[in-house]
């Protein structure tokens, strides 16, 4: 499976409240940017766990703490998903 995570411009952002989990509830208006995206490829494998590989621009986070692996761990915990290879083609600059 290959997904395109489109870039978007935040036109408005309102922080509503801080939640008990430390995150915030937000209200936002975003505008998609055509043709600028990160590409995420997920392939099932026979090996347990997740293999992660990033290509393109630098991924600015600690190893094992990127959002792709966090999503995998949630799917693993809640749905028993196991054995995947994840490739992130990073085209959108971090924080953009």
Language model features by range: what are they?
Residues 1-94:
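ATP-binding N-lobe of GHMP and related small-molecule kinases
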